Regions:
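Intrinsically disordered, low-complexity acidic Ser/Thr-rich regulatory segments
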Residues: 1-86, 139-164
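Forkhead-associated
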Residues: 73, 92-151
Length: 164
């Protein structure tokens, strides 16, 4: 009888711990801390959405998606992040919300002959305050992308940036 009671208490505690985490995660999605920059992202592969989610700026660098490990990979990181700390991706769409103002770096990495990644180029991504404005385009490296963020989400499309 005592063992059964102890087991029941342990089970209830485990359920409560999981519920607490679930409620906290759910609460995060609805109440965004205004001081944090939010990046909501979608990963598409072969014109199909394979992943969707969101991150805060303190979770960068962040890998959006990978296309069979081929070259021309890209990642978005906070400005000033060293290249060797940046993960890399080959294709991504991401949305910048109105609180995500600031500067970011976009890194491009290519596979070298021995199959190891090396940094090839980087560019600056600037998110500014502005009126309703939506951008969707292929990133060209060695240039600066300026986006205006507002209550509508801004889309940046990154696809095979090594090709120009």
């Amino acid at each position: 009888d005592l063992m059964g009671l102890i087991l029941l208490i342990v089970c209830i505690l485990i359920i409560l711990i999981f519920l607490k985490d679930y409620i906290r995660l759910g609460g995060k999605k609805t109440t965004i801390n205004k001081k944090q920059k939010m990046i909501v992202y979608e990963v598409h592969q072969n014109n199909k959405r394979i992943q969707q989610g969101w991150i805060t700026d303190d979770q960068l660098p962040f890998q959006f998606g990978r296309n069979a490990g081929s070259g021309n990979d890209v990642v978005v990181v906070p400005e000033g992040t060293p290249a060797d700390e940046a993960a890399s991706v080959s294709r991504a769409w991401f949305y910048i919300q109105k609180d995500a103002l600031g500067n970011y770096m976009v890194y491009s990495a290519e596979l070298s002959g021995d199959g190891k990644k090396r940094q090839s180029e980087k560019k600056k991504l600037v998110v500014e305050n502005g009126n309703t404005w939506k951008a969707m385009h292929t990133v060209k490296l060695q240039s600066e992308v300026r986006l205006k963020a507002d209550q509508f989400q801004v889309i940046l499309d990154v696809e095979n940036p090594g090709e120009s």
